[in-house]
A protein has these predicted regions:
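Inter-lobe coupling/hinge region of RecA-like P-loop helicase motors
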Residues: 1-49, 103-104, 146, 158-171, ...
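Well-ordered alpha-helical segments embedded in enzymatic catalytic cores
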Residues: 25-35, 55, 86, 352-353
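Conserved helicase C-terminal RecA-like lobe
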Residues: 42-43, 53-68, 81, 88-364, ...
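Acidic, low-complexity intrinsically disordered tails
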Residues: 402-403
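Conserved beta-strand scaffold positions in the cores of enzyme catalytic domains, especially
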Residues: 13-16, 70-72, 273
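Glycine-rich loop motifs involved in handling phospho/adenylate chemistry
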Residues: 75-82
């Protein structure tokens, strides 16, 4: 099968660029978007498509720094924004005593700014409060926090929230104790409203955290407004409108939100940011595809292999069993063949996404990649999609990533 342009379709342009770091890539992208607009392209005719929500959030932050009006399409990308993440974290803490990562994030965030020494003391106190826990030598903070979130048995898992409510003789500074008291008081006040309808509770949390006032000062409350609307209209499968149902949906959107929500960009004159999944059926004059690097796009297989992961539902029991690979032979050869079939299925799925991404631009497609980003120990290589785009465009070759 060969793809051909439609009859009468104007010529398009493909640009291919590569950068040493993700920061350099995003700086260039934001500068180029601004330049395109200055040359006459409306903001609404520009889109940035990414494979992952974390990249989407980084693009949003960089465009905002350049005063570019921008809209994130889809709830998954909103959840990592600095005005949304504390709301979701607070909602989880209100319902889950083992939401240790969220408690730690809130306490060390801009609002409470608990010091690392105080957090380490709190983590040790959390271990002390576990029934039957024997005293241990203090661990480095990173190991303390890792242990807090890694225990599989809830009955023996430490709870930072328990330690916040009962710090005992923990070596916490006076200022830290004062902040923890205000933190617990705020949570207690919010818990008194857990029986409210979920949208009202969400608004109450936003108000209590002072986020709406903060965004008013910055001149943009649109993302908060969109989050509130999403929380008011989420697909309530259980029909009880519970906070637990909302949080389960938000978790699913962030982790597996490939198509849980239909993309509906507004008509506002703003650059549209969305994951490739949500771009199906949409087109823009200019489309940017950043981070076409190995491990990003194509992404790694998140569906997993049920034969090696007991947490996954066996493929024969899934509702889409007829449309996915099945393990036909339980011998080693059969299991190896099944594993390879899963890899091929994942590759085909990523190829479909790449097709969607590459065909969203009416006139200009800008493809870029990077080698380094925070947290990497080895440089990323160029993805095969980047190489495919480079083959369509005469560009300066990207040097191989450094060893």
């Amino acid at each position: 099968m060969e793809l051909r342009p439609g009859e009468g379709a104007p010529d398009g342009e493909v640009r291919v660029l590569c950068f040493d770091t993700l920061a350099e890539e995003l700086d260039w992208l934001a500068t180029d978007v601004t330049a395109r607009h200055a040359e006459g392209t409306a903001w609404r005719d520009i889109a940035v498509l990414t494979r992952r929500n974390d990249v989407l959030t980084s693009v949003w932050e960089r465009l905002r720094e350049h005063d570019v009006p921008v809209e994130i399409v889809g709830i998954g990308g909103l959840l990592r924004l600095p005005e949304i993440a504390p709301v979701v974290a607070t909602l989880k803490v209100l319902t889950d005593p083992l939401a240790n990562a969220e408690v730690a994030g809130l306490l060390t965030g801009e609002r409470w700014r608990l010091g690392l020494a105080d957090l380490a003391a709190l983590a040790r106190r959390a271990r002390e409060l576990v029934p039957g826990e024997t005293a241990k030598e203090p661990l480095p903070l990173s190991e303390e926090l890792t242990e807090l979130v890694s225990r599989a048995d809830p009955a023996r898992a430490p709870s930072l929230l328990d330690a916040v409510n009962d710090p005992g003789e923990a070596a916490i500074s006076d200022e830290g104790k004062a902040r923890l008291e205000r933190f617990t008081s705020e949570l207690a006040e919010l818990r008194r409203h857990l029986d409210e309808p979920v949208p009202e509770l969400v608004r109450r949390v936003i108000s209590r955290l002072g986020l709406e006032a903060e965004q008013l000062v910055r001149g943009d409350t649109s993302q908060l407004a969109r989050f509130i609307v999403a929380c008011s209209t989420y697909p309530d499968i259980d029909g009880d409108g519970s906070l637990a149902g909302l949080l389960a949906w938000l978790d699913a959107e962030e982790e597996h939100g490939d198509a849980l929500e239909r993309a509906t960009p507004t008509a506002a004159d703003s650059v549209k940011l969305l994951t490739v999944h949500r771009a199906k059926g949409l087109e823009w004059h200019t489309v940017y595809l950043p981070a076409l690097s190995e491990g990003v796009f194509p992404g790694t297989d998140r569906t997993g292999n049920w034969s090696t992961n007991s947490r996954l539902l066996p493929a024969p029991l899934r509702g889409d069993a007829d449309a996915i690979p099945q393990l036909a032979d339980y011998s080693k050869r059969g299991i190896d063949a099944y594993r390879e079939e899963l890899k091929q299925e994942h590759r085909l799925s990523e190829d479909r996404l790449a097709y969607v991404a590459a065909t969203r631009a009416k006139r200009l497609l800008v493809v870029s990649a990077h080698s380094w980003e925070p947290g990497l120990k080895r440089a990323r290589g160029r993805s095969r999609y980047f190489e495919d785009a480079a083959a369509l465009h005469e560009s300066s070759p990207m040097p191989p990533p450094p060893e």
